[in-house]
């Protein structure tokens, strides 16, 4: 079965730059979308609202982990 863009779902979002762009752009403005915004994304991607919520949660978690790792690496002292 051949899928067109409208039939793709959120689990394929990382492999498609087209799909990711909308979510990434929105995330850069607002990391916590409201129910209506989540519903709009779910309709656009034709998937469950839960998948959209999980994408935003995962993105926030990855960002938090990345900033935490950057802080840890910046605070290392080396003595000779």
From Swiss-Prot:
This protein's record includes keyword ATP-binding: no
Checking SUPFAM superfamilies in the record gives: Homeodomain-like
* Pfam families to which the protein is assigned, alphabetical: Homeodomain
Task: Please list the residue ranges that the record marks as compositionally biased, kind Low complexity.
Answer: 70-80
- Looking at the UniProt feature table, which residue ranges are given for the DNA-binding region? 8-67
What GO MF annotations does this protein's record show?
DNA binding
Q: Where in the cell is it found?
A: Nucleus
Q: Name one GO cellular component term.
A: nucleus
Q: Give the range the annotation lists for the signal sequence.
A: none
Q: Where is this region: Disordered?
A: 60-80
Keyword Nucleus belongs to the record: yes
Q: What is this protein called?
A: Homeobox protein 7
Look up and give the organism this protein is from: Dictyostelium discoideum
Source organism phylogeny:
Eukaryota, Amoebozoa, Evosea, Eumycetozoa, Dictyostelia
């Amino acid at each position: 079965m051949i899928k067109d863009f409208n039939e793709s779902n959120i689990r394929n979002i990382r492999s498609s730059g087209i799909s990711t762009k909308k979510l990434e752009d929105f995330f850069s403005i607002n990391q916590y979308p409201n129910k209506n915004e989540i519903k709009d994304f779910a309709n656009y991607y034709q998937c469950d609202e839960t998948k959209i919520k999980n994408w935003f949660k995962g993105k926030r978690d990855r960002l938090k982990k990345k900033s935490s790792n950057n802080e840890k690496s910046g605070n290392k002292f080396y003595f000779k």
